């Protein structure tokens, strides 16, 4: 879930970690704290031209496994293990 996360300076990373720890010390779960801080960072860097473009999981929902391999590529189950005794 790093879609659209910008590259952060060391100082920005430290600030993010401190905010996450602060939220957790107040009783928030680590997942919630990370999600909240990530959303804040995305909002601050919304129009940042250096923000990395990373694909979301749903970008691949319309594709099947066969879309990502060649037709002549064998299934893992069909490959005989040549190194077995």
UniProtKB/Swiss-Prot annotation:
Region (Disordered): 57-85
Domain of life: Bacteria
Bias type Acidic residues, positions: 73-85
Biased segments, Basic and acidic residues type: 57-72
UniProt family annotation: Belongs to the UPF0181 family.
Name recorded for this polypeptide: UPF0181 protein YPTS_1774
Organism: Yersinia pseudotuberculosis serotype IB (strain PB1/+)
